[in-house]
């Protein structure tokens, strides 16, 4: 083999491999252990659903939180009216990481573009560790918001997105 006279480091690039920054954040592993909980908060007129997937280090890597309004909630008839004849008209808010982003679905809000609000884009590959921290932080924020300051959370929903 001839010597490399130019002293350059030639590397063959595999064009079939996408750049690292385009690697998507992984979807939840439905076969992995999932922590699920349902909390009936009758005094608030809500039912709160929690699903979380944790990594080996205890960080929440995926989550789904849903706050449902029951018929005991003062806003129930308004929710029913705004949602129409759909069977799931009592759903107020759901926050999850299903589609490579941390996002919120907000229903019944009288504002434009109220169905989805994107908070953070997530990435895999080199950026996955940073994305995991974003997911874990978002989980704590929404978890605490729904559990400890639920009335503030519902007021925000009634007013629309800030």
Protein language model regions, located:
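Acidic, aromatic-enriched beta-alpha/helix-loop junctions
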Residues: 62-115
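Negatively charged, low-complexity tracts enriched in Asp/Glu with abundant Ser/Thr
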Residues: 2-81
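Generic intrinsically disordered, low-complexity segments enriched for polar/acidic and small residues
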Residues: 7, 22, 60, 86, ...
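Glutamate identity and glutamate-enriched acidic tracts
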Residues: 21, 30-37, 43, 52, ...
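Intrinsically disordered, low-complexity regions
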Residues: 2, 31-32, 36, 57, ...
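Acidic, low-complexity intrinsically disordered segments
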Residues: 111-161
